[in-house]
């Protein structure tokens, strides 16, 4: 009797055809009624994915109140139920003819399995010819909440036709939106459906009409149109993007990205993806012929991919190219200098990791993307770069070596002529009609050079239950081979083969105390963790060494325990200093959560530190404050969880020498119901060279649920120093069981000149179907920390872990 269930998978695939267009993102169904549109049937087996996988091997049980007819023409009457695994078919009457293969199921026909439910008035067909007809259908997709109806379904083998069907994820009694199609042809063998004259309705109003479209009904990808994206901005005008998906093969595909901008013209783009065992990649290209605003062709190419050579080695590449220095500003909407950079990085390399070692060979190149700057602002290219790191314990000792060899090159720079003032003596008026001119006058000719950096070390990490003591001795040798152009560039002395060699000694020690205590009726574990770090590095004159990739670290609590002030190998500071620091934590004993943490520390300098990065040949390296005998700024970090909703944090640096604060950062966060959040932050940094204010900003952002359906979003990011906003976002969100609408108005700084731009973003999300408009999630997730609540619990990358693509010989365990 298993044969009688042969029709069941076919109506299932027909009804699922429209929901196969659903978006990949999870949706919030919390506003939906608790009762399913089509509740489960009495007597049906419980949902069981394992039973669904085994259904073809399980027997079919048939039962009913009465059985009549003959052995070849059985007739079941009253509460007929057919069960196999997770499948259930119920009807009032079932007549079968085992010789001809005909069957008829009438009266309250019901079908259910793990993921699908359906009711119909009648089902009839022939098992031998595999033809079936089901009339007056209502269905529900259990996991997606998708539901709808159809007047009838005709099936012939793997091919079927659905007549006068609908689909929605809304409650059937109040469908805010639904898709109607008078006819849908489905080919289960090929995995696609074809709808004719389909209409998307919002309420009873048709908003989109599709005379013909083809779509997948299973996981197999199909060529076709994706939902469009559109927006409006002062920079590009009306902006419309229509993605066209091309399913080229099971392991690679492409998406055409034609884009129309009313102020610029048509841009042609494409995205190609490939996947194979051991690797994958993606390349995106865009081309805009004769930009109407810039009067020239524009374009970009981006590629990223990797290949696993074996279990230890992986090849990776990331390549970026744009046609001109205005491209990033014109075709992206991030904050220049805040959400994006003034340059693009391209890297190609192979990287290895073993139990005690990491290694890599790579090449890196930079491209300028800020039209207000010249090539002097670019970092040096590393072409190529090889590194090897090794560390291993030997009894109570640990030994290791950090090694790097790099060839540095740099593009020559040319003067950029800024716009002229409109009135003599007036500040530059840099509106959209002003033009920066890249001249042919060479500003600086850069040479090239190679660097070898070796840093072997041995340490003796000792520890107990309440203490640790780790002395470390390292030797650092750095040698260069420079071309004549670079060697003769001041302040270098002309030596083409300078070198530096010096020892580095340190002792890191700490204690751990804890006690059980109680405060306001809550039990805590209170810790006290004093720490001492002594560092000695003798002075070496390094004025004849170039500066390629070295910058001063930003002074922070972590900097108190490093053996150098610099990120790279071009400088190694001399030091005779002692760090004294302490941390105290209050941990709730019932759940282990940290109620309060306080950390404070200071460096005592026993002598002047004579090595600096000042007056280097590299403009990007910047400058730093000299360090004299005495004390560093106090560094204090604090985090306080007022309650489970409200938390505060602060970082403060006070300099006893200038009797001023070097840095202050205050932040607070309050979690609201329904995933709401309020963030408030203040940031201040002082320029340690001229004692001026370097940065002074306030940042306020929120996601405020007005009620379960409506919420307001916003951000006000303001520079107190410049007395102007950096970004303003205001918007509303409306959410329901099956539809979400988001609208944003955004004003933001778009370039280094401080010019502002405006944009309007609107997105419609038809839950369980798709979304169209601009991707507002990306904007809000960047602007409002906690817009996705899970983002609050992501662990930031540690600055003490080894990144295979970021050699740093200054990090010694």
Swiss-Prot record:
Record's signal peptide: 1-22
Keywords, in A-Z order: Cell outer membrane, Membrane, Signal
Source organism, top-level taxon: Bacteria
A GO-annotated cellular component: cell outer membrane
Subcellular location: Cell outer membrane
Entries under InterPro entries matching the protein: LipoPS_assembly_LptD, LptD, LptD_C, OstA-like_N
UniProt lineage: Bacteria, Pseudomonadati, Pseudomonadota, Gammaproteobacteria, Lysobacterales
Function: Together with LptE, is involved in the assembly of lipopolysaccharide (LPS) at the surface of the outer membrane.
The keyword 4Fe-4S is annotated on this UniProt entry: no
Family from the record: Belongs to the LptD family.
Gene: lptD
Protein's UniProt name: LPS-assembly protein LptD
Protein source organism: Xanthomonas oryzae pv. oryzae (strain MAFF 311018)
């Amino acid at each position: 009797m298993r044969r009688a269930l042969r029709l069941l998978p076919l109506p299932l695939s027909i009804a699922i055809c429209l929901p196969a267009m659903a978006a990949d993102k999870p949706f919030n169904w919390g506003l939906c009624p608790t009762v399913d549109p089509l509740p489960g049937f009495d007597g049906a087996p419980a949902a069981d994915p394992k039973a669904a996988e085994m259904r073809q091997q399980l027997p079919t049980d048939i039962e009913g109140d009465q059985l009549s007819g003959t052995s070849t023409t059985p007739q079941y009457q009253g509460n007929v139920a057919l069960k196999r695994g997770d499948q259930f078919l119920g009807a009032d009457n079932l007549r079968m003819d085992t010789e001809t293969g005909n069957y008829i199921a009438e009266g309250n026909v019901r079908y259910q399995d793990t993921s699908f439910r359906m009711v119909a008035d009648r089902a009839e067909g022939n098992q031998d010819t595999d033809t079936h007809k089901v009339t007056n259908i209502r269905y529900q997709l259990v996991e997606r909440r998708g539901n709808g109806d159809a007047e009838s379904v005709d099936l012939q083998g793997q091919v079927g036709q659905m007549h006068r069907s609908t689909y929605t994820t809304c409650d059937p009694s109040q469908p805010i939106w639904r898709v109607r199609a008078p006819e849908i042809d489905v080919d289960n063998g090929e995995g696609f459906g074809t709808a004719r004259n389909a209409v998307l309705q919002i309420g009873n109003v048709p908003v989109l009409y599709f005379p013909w479209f083809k779509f997948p009904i299973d996981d197999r990808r199909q060529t076709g149109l994706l939902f469009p994206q559109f927006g409006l901005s002062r920079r590009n005008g009306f902006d419309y993007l229509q993605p066209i998906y091309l399913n080229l093969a099971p392991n690679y595909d492409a998406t055409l990205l034609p884009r129309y901008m009313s102020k610029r013209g048509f841009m042609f783009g494409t995205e190609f993806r490939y996947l194979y065992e051991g690797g994958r990649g993606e390349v995106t290209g865009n081309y805009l012929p004769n930009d109407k605003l810039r009067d020239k062709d524009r374009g970009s190419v981006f590629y990223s991919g990797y290949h696993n050579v074996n279990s230890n080695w992986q090849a990776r590449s990331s390549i970026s190219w744009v046609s001109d220095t205005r491209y990033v500003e014109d075709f992206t909407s991030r904050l220049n200098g805040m959400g994006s950079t003034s340059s693009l990085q391209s890297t190609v390399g192979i990287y290895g990791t073993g139990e005690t070692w990491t290694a890599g060979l790579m090449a890196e190149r930079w491209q300028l993307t800020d039209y207000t700057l010249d090539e002097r602002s670019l970092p040096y290219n590393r072409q190529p770069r090889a590194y090897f790191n090794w560390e291993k314990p030997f009894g109570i000792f640990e030994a290791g070596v950090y090694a790097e060899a790099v060839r540095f090159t740099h593009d020559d720079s040319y003067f950029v002529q800024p716009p002229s003032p409109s009135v003599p003596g007036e500040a530059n008026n840099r509106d959209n009609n002003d033009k920066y001119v890249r001249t042919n006058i060479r500003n600086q000719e850069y040479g090239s050079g190679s660097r070898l950096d070796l840093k072997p070390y041995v340490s003796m990490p000792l520890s107990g239950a309440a203490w640790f003591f780790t002395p470390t001795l390292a030797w650092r040798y750095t040698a260069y081979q420079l071309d004549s152009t670079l060697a003769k560039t001041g302040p270098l002395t002309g030596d083409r083969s300078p070198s530096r060699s010096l020892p580095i000694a340190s002792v890191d020690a700490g204690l751990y105390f804890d006690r059980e205590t109680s405060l306001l009726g809550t039990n805590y574990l209170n810790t006290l963790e004093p720490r001492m770090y002594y560092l000695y590095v003798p002075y070496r004159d390094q004025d004849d060494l170039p500066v390629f990739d070295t910058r001063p670290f930003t002074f922070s609590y972590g900097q108190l325990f490093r053996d150098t002030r610099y990120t790279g190998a071009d400088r190694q500071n001399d030091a005779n200093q002692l760090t004294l620091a302490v941390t105290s934590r209050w941990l709730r004993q019932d759940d282990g959560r940290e109620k309060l943490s306080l950390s404070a520390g200071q460096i005592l300098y026993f002598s002047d530190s004579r090595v600096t990065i000042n007056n280097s040949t590299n403009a990007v390296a910047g400058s730093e404050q000299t360090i004299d005998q005495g004390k560093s700024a106090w560094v204090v970090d604090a985090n306080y969880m007022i309650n489970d909703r409200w938390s505060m944090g602060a970082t403060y640096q006070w300099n006893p020498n200038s009797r001023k604060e070097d840095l202050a950062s205050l932040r607070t966060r309050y979690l609201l119901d329904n995933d709401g959040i309020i963030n408030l932050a203040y940031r201040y940094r002082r320029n340690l060279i001229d004692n001026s204010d370097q940065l002074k900003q306030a940042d306020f952002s929120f996601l405020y649920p007005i009620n379960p359906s409506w919420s307001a979003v916003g951000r006000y990011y303001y520079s107190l120093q410049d007395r102007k906003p950096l970004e303003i976002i205001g918007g509303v969100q409306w959410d329901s069981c099956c539809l979400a609408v988001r609208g944003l108005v955004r004003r933001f700084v778009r370039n280094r000149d401080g010019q502002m731009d405006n944009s309007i973003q609107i997105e419609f999300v038809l839950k369980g179907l798709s979304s169209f408009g601009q991707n507002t999630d990306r904007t809000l997730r960047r602007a409002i920390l906690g817009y996705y609540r899970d983002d609050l619990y992501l662990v930031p990358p540690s600055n003490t872990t080894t990144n295979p693509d970021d050699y740093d010989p200054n990090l010694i365990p």
